[in-house]
Regions:
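Bacterial N-terminal signal peptides
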Residues: 8-19
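N-terminal hydrophobic or amphipathic helices and topogenic motifs
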Residues: 10, 23-105, 289-332
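Bilobed "Venus flytrap"/periplasmic-binding protein-like clamshell domains
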Residues: 65-88, 123, 146-214, 221, ...
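Periplasmic-binding protein-like
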Residues: 68, 143-152, 239-277, 287-307
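A local structural motif
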Residues: 88-99, 191-206, 242-244, 321, ...
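Short helices/loops that flank or line small-molecule/ion binding pockets
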Residues: 104-118, 131, 165, 209-229
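Acidic, polar ligand-binding/catalytic clefts
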Residues: 108-166
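Ligand-binding "clamshell"
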Residues: 128-140, 234-248
C-alpha cells in the first residue's frame, strides 16, 4: 500500500469525511479517572477504553499517522516513509502522513477523530491520553531496552551562565506548553536549584526543541531546556559541534516519545496496528536518526509514564483541558 503525505489540516479534514466521526461522550461510564468526559476508564489503566457501543467503533479505509513536531516536520515525513508503507501493507489500509505543526494541533486532531495513529512527545503523551483518547502502546528502543532521554539546559560556549541559578533575569527559551523536557520539567525541577521559571526569568516559547537550540546558537536566547535526543541528533548530523555549546544541567531520565492509537478503533484493527509496530525493523535511515534504535517495544502507560505524570503535577500543570487551554493561550 502506498503512503500519502499531506501537510494541511484541510487535507486531513477531507480524510475525516471518509469514515471518521467525532468522539461521543461516555454517558454510561462508571469511572473515568482523570480522562475527559468523552472517555471511560473502568479498568483503571489510565487510558480510554473502547466505546461500549460497538456502533461507535471505527475501521476506516484510510489511516492517518502523525509524528510529534519536535523538529522540522518534513524531516520525519521522509524518515517514516518506509514504516508507513509497511503499515499500509500490514493493515491493507491507505496511509496518510499528517504533517502537524504543534503538539496542540496533534492532540486536537486525535480528539476530533481525524488522527488514528500518532508518535507523541513524552510530555504530550499524558495530555493526549486524557484529552484525546490516545492509547499509548509502543516506544522506540533496541535490544537493551526502551529509549530514554534527559533534559539538558544548553548555553552558548562563550556564555557566562554556569548554573541554573545564573538563569535569573536571562532570556530563556522553553519549547511548548505540553513539552516535558522543554517546559514542565523546568517548572518542576528548577525551583530546587533556586530558580522559578516565569518569576526569575520570563518564559519565551520557541515552538520546538530544534528552534530553541538554533536560537541559542544564534544568540537569540541565552539558554534553553531541551531534550537530549535533539541535542545528540544535531551533533550526529553535523548541524553543530559538541563544543559550540555547554550543557549546564542534566536531569534524570524520562521515557522518550510514545506511539498511540485512537481508543475507538475496532479491537481487531488496534491489535493489527500494534502487531505491525512490533514486527517492524527500523530502516537504516531510521536507525541512524534515532541513535541506534532499531525496533518498537511495548509500554504500559500507567507504569512507564508515572515519572512524567509526576513532573506535570509537581509543575502545577495537570493533564486537563483547562490547563491545556491556559498554557496554549500563554503561548499565543
Amino acid at each position: 500500500m502506498r503512503s500519502v503525505y499531506l501537510a494541511s489540516a484541510v487535507a486531513l479534514s477531507l480524510v475525516s469525511m471518509l469514515g471518521s466521526t467525532a468522539v461521543h461522550a461516555a454517558d454510561d461510564c462508571k469511572s473515568r479517572g482523570e480522562l475527559d468526559t468523552n472517555y471511560c476508564d473502568e479498568d483503571n489503566n489510565l487510558v480510554a477504553q473502547a466505546p461500549k457501543d460497538k456502533a461507535k467503533w471505527k475501521d476506516p479505509s484510510t489511516l492517518v499517522f502523525a509524528y510529534t513536531p519536535i523538529e522540522d516536520p518534513a524531516v520525519y515525513a521522509n524518515l517514516f516513509k518506509d514504516f508507513t508503507e509497511y503499515l499500509g501493507t500490514y493493515t491493507q489500509k491507505k496511509i496518510v502522513y499528517y504533517t502537524v505543526q504543534s503538539n496542540a494541533a496533534q492532540i486536537e486532531a486525535m480528539r476530533s477523530g481525524r488522527l488514528h495513529v500518532a508518535g507523541l512527545a513524552s510530555g504530550e503523551t499524558g495530555l493526549a491520553a486524557n484529552l484525546a483518547g490516545a492509547v499509548p502502546f509502543a516506544i522506540k528502543g533496541n535490544k537493551d531496552g526502551p529509549r530514554m532521554y534527559r533534559q539538558f539546559v544548553v548555553v552558548k560556549k562563550e556564555s557566562n551562565i554556569k548554573t541554573i541559578a545564573d538563569l535569573k533575569g536571562r532570556k530563556v527559551a522553553h519549547t511548548a506548553p505540553s513539552s516535558n523536557s522543554g517546559h514542565l520539567a523546568p517548572l518542576a525541577l528548577f525551583p530546587k536549584e533556586g530558580v522559578t521559571p516565569g518569576k526569575d526569568y520570563n518564559i519565551v516559547f520557541s515552538g520546538k526543541h530544534d528552534q530553541s537550540l538554533a536560537g541559542v546558537l544564534k544568540e537569540d536566547y541565552e539558554a534553553a531546556p531541551i531534550t537530549s535526543d535533539i541535542y545528540d541528533r544535531w551533533i550526529m548530523r553535523g548541524q553543530m559541534k559538541a563544543d559550540d555549546t555547554r550543557i549546564i544541567y542534566r536531569s534524570g531520565t524520562f521515557p522518550t516519545s510514545s506511539f498511540a492509537h485512537a481508543h475507538d478503533l475496532t479491537p481487531v484493527l488496534a491489535d493489527k496496528i500494534k502487531k505491525c509496530f512490533f514486527d517492524y525493523k527500523f530502516s537504516p535511515e531510521m536507525q541512524k536518526e534515532f541513535l541506534g534504535d532499531d525496533r518498537f517495544l511495548p509500554v504500559d502507560y500507567k507504569k512507564d509514564w508515572k515519572l512524567v505524570r509526576g513532573v506535570a503535577l509537581a509543575s502545577g500543570t495537570p493533564y486537563n483541558r483547562a490547563q491545556f487551554d491556559k498554557e496554549n493561550a500563554k503561548k499565543k
